[in-house]
Curated annotation (Swiss-Prot):
Gene3D superfamilies referenced in this protein's UniProt entry, alphabetically: Aspartate Aminotransferase, domain 1, Type I PLP-dependent aspartate aminotransferase-like (Major domain)
Binding site for substrate: 21, 133, 352
InterPro entries: Aminotrans_II_pyridoxalP_BS, Aminotransferase_I/II_large, AON_synthase_class-II, AONS_Archaea/Proteobacteria, AONS_Proteobacteria, PyrdxlP-dep_Trfase, PyrdxlP-dep_Trfase_major, PyrdxlP-dep_Trfase_small
Designated name of the protein: 8-amino-7-oxononanoate synthase
Residues that hold pyridoxal 5'-phosphate according to the record: 108-109, 179, 207, 233
Length: 384
């Protein structure tokens, strides 16, 4: 089989399964409204949970940062790309979340890959929730360590896997809020079992940070858990992009020596770090509380209105509200129907989610209004 035949076969298989991904160029895609092909849609696909991507203070901070520092960092943080603004953001994140240190990364994907690649050796074992994000599971699969997966949120299964002999160290990996189901991990129970077996815990809280807990401190703070490794990302609650790893001073020093994704990547622009500092300030103050409270009200309104629909509604109290329809083609048809009625919704299909669980991944944000939720419910009930 030639290269071209191999590529064609893979694409044909995706097409046949109604699983071929495609991108839609949008003129605006992160706020309450999505604009594509000169048409405006209510946007139920954005991860901008607090509606901060268009916040005037955050925009102004980025503009001022660009004027002062330029539009790029100029290099890796190990060379010339680590600015006083990066340092200030790391210190503010560490203080906010109760850690000694924070290290910035270009993306959550890079942060997860970097930590696992740097920390794990052949004699070690990773025990991961089987619904963990692709960045975590891919890094675990590519690492020299053994990978074992426990049934989603099943602490008893996790305990059994941890109890089996391991010559090295054990790292338990999970998410705070799961990206495709919107449910939360029982972090306190997971940490207890992990500590009983002398393991370390790594939590990716991409979808909880900024959105839940006191001052938006996220899933771990809410459940009174402090994992050895906490990954937070800035493309969701913060409304920007990038990520950070929160850890001890010793682990931070170790990652600065051995995390290749950090060492060999150009660091985020200082202007972006400036915008993230402004976003963090909004998240921590009363305005952040008001946005989180509004989001909770919107979620409650939506869940109350979909109980009688012929779909499986995931057990989620988060901004992620999946309607599981099962069949790929049906999910695509429903997403298209919603778009025709002015609601932009994304159909998520395998391999992103398990086979037979294709879904509409609906996301609600503080930028929405109650009438937006009512309109979505109207269309879902076939009255659009």
């Amino acid at each position: 089989m030639s290269w071209q035949e191999k590529i064609n076969a893979a694409l044909d298989a995706r097409r046949t399964a109604d699983a071929l991904r495609r991108r839609y160029p949008v003129a605006q895609g992160a706020g309450r409204w999505l604009v594509a092909d000169d048409r405006q849609y209510l946007n139920f696909s954005s991860n901008d949970y607090l509606g901060l991507s268009h916040h005037p203070q955050i925009i102004r901070a980025w503009q001022q940062g660009a004027e002062k520092f330029g539009v790029g960092s100029g290099g890796s943080g190990h060379v010339s790309g680590y600015s006083v603004v990066h340092q200030a953001l790391e210190e503010e994140l560490a203080e906010w979340l109760g850690y000694s240190r924070a290290l910035l990364f270009i993306s959550g994907f890079a942060a997860n890959q970097a930590v696992i690649a740097a920390m794990m050796a052949k004699e070690d074992r990773i025990v991961a929730d089987r619904l963990s994000h692709a960045s975590l599971l891919e890094a675990a699969s590519l690492s020299p360590s053994q990978l074992r997966r426990f049934t989603h949120n099943d602490v008893a299964h996790l305990a059994r896997l941890l109890a089996s002999p391991c010559p090295g160290q054990q790292l338990v990996v999970t998410e705070g809020v799961f990206s495709m189901d919107g449910d939360s991990a029982p972090l306190a129970e997971i940490q207890q079992v992990t500590q009983q077996h002398n393991g370390w815990l790594m939590v990716d809280d991409a979808h909880g940070t900024g959105v839940i807990g006191e001052q938006g401190r996220g899933s771990c703070w809410l459940q009174k858990v402090k994992p050895e490794l906490l990954v937070v990302t800035f493309g969701k609650g913060f409304g920007v992009s990038g990520a950070a790893v929160l850890c001890s001073s010793t682990v931070a020093d170790y990652l600065l020596q051995f995390a290749r994704h950090l060492i060999y990547s150009t660091s985020m622009p200082p202007a972006q770090a400036q915008a993230l500092r402004a976003s963090l300030a909004v998240i921590r103050r009363d305005e952040g509380d008001a946005r989180r409270e509004k989001l909770v009200s919107l979620i409650a309104r939506f869940r109350a209105g979909v109980q009688d629909l012929p779909f499986t509604l995931a057990d989620s109290c988060s901004a992620i509200q999946p309607l599981i329809v099962g069949d790929n083609s049906r999910a695509l048809q429903l997403a298209e129907k919603l778009r025709q009625q002015g609601c932009w919704v994304t159909a998520i299909r395998p391999p992103t989610v398990p086979a037979g669980t294709a879904r509409l991944r609906l996301t609600l944000t503080a930028a929405h209004e109650m009438q937006d939720i009512d309109r979505l419910l109207e269309v879902l009930h076939g009255n659009g």
